[in-house]
Amino acid sequence: AAEHLHGSGASAVFIARGIYGNPWVFGDARALAFDGTPVPSRSSVERLEALREHLTLTHELLPLMSRARTYASWYLKGMPHAAAWRAQVVRCSTYEEFMALVDDIERDVVVCEAALAAGEPVPAHPLEA
């Protein structure tokens, strides 16, 4: 993206849907475009922390949590067992249910990523074990 911005002479970049599940995208784009700083990849735990904050802010502004299902799906993209967790997300209807589920997801992600780092297979999804 930085090469295209500098090479084309454009003065702006349209980020669009890149923001979904990636609240860092504006800071990352700025750092890359102006400083050439490489964009760091965020860990799954960092993404889940951002999801918690997003859910909390949503709940404070609009206690009806139906939109939160969409937000949660964005943040789960690419995580171990993401499809199984998204199936659980659609069953959540309260803030408390969402937060408890995010805690469960984090525990699972930590175990899965540790297994991958050790060269071991990813354990089965907790609800399938």
Where are these regions (language model features)?
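Alpha/beta catalytic cores of nucleotide-metabolism and tRNA/nucleoside-modifying enzymes
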Residues: 1-129
